[in-house]
From Swiss-Prot:
The gene is dadA. Its cofactor is FAD. Its EC number is 1.4.99.-. GO terms for molecular function: D-amino-acid dehydrogenase activity. The keyword Protein transport does not apply. The lineage of its organism: Bacteria, Pseudomonadati, Pseudomonadota, Gammaproteobacteria, Vibrionales. It comes from Vibrio cholerae serotype O1 (strain M66-2). Keywords: FAD, Flavoprotein, Oxidoreductase. This is D-amino acid dehydrogenase. Belongs to the DadA oxidoreductase family. Transmembrane segments: none annotated.
Amino acid sequence: MMEVLVLGSGVVGLTSAWYLAQAGHDVTVVDRQPRGAEETSFANAGQISYGYSSPWAAPGIPQKALKWMLEKHAPLKIQPSLDPALLSWMGKMLLNCQLSRYQVNKSRMLAIANYSRECLKALNQTYSLDYQGRQRGTLQVFRDEKQLTAIEKDMQLLAQSGVRFELLNVAQCLTHEPGLAPVQEKLVGGLWLPDDETGDCYLFCQQLTELAKQQGVRFHFDCHIQQLVCEGKKIIGVQTDLGLLKADAYVVALGSYSTSLLKPLGIEIPVYPVKGYSLTLPIIDEKFAPQSTVMDETYKVALTRFSDRIRVAGTAELAGFDPAIPEARKATIEMVARDLFPHGGDFAKGQFWTGFRPMTPDGTPIIGATPYTNLYTNTGHGTLGWTMACGSASILADVLTHGESPLSRLGLDLFRYPKAS
């Protein structure tokens, strides 16, 4: 058994702490917020999207990005910048848009997602967590025939990875999401992913925090991390505003903020804060609300059903750590919600939110060892932190405890990036 410090209490940090504790370690979580999941995990899309696990870096994206720059409601926005970190990250992302790399990255992501599904299933079977979860799948809807044609390559990868799916016509889409009936003329079909789930990530995190406390995990909230202190290639402590915290091993699970903490150690990981937005609406008419998750392929916006709320989330914006919520981004999210489910939610009571998704240029998270003997990472999950959290945490616990995991062959640690090591 080792004493382990987990830095970060988002869904990835909390699940890391949980699985490390289950492996027999003495775990402490450190975070600057007053409780867990107060940042990127707070109001995300609510999707647990095993079948939708796919990198943003895909064939055709460079051409689409140029077109999106001229569109009012584009799914990708890039704020002009000469930031070297952004330019480097974008260059790496463009390289990963090649078909061969896309296929490798997507298959890797699907493997993590499928493993995570089994981990979350086992957790729920034991503890019956109540986070307004539903197991009714994801319906990816298409507005034009080109999208239907383009999805065929993804379907091949899904089949190879053992992910269940079904290509649907519009009438079949309505059997899963009858609330789309008033706008069915806007659709040409959909892809049904029956094994996907939904749930409020924030509620999950609060319940997991309490479970972890019962298992002996300690939490230092309102504690600001300043730097990692090392001797040679070993970490000897974490300097915080409350003093130096020491352990046998350290896990960096700080999302987009992992990069700045690791850089002084000579570790440069290509994780960039890709800004996302959400809108949460009270449901006013259940028959016109989504039943699970509807993913609008055109705008890359997800509409997810909680018990009495609709969570609308989307947009990828490259703008650094700017916390502002521009009116234009609000307009895009609200437009899609009104376009597909105009009578389902109370738009007058909608609440907007933004968060910084920690995204790698290849879409795959960075899980595992580092050049420092007792330092580990679990970060870079992008839009799929909720989807991959349990599986990633289990992989991390295996690597920290045994030196490897069943998925080590995928090359998930930072050593896949030459400059990082």
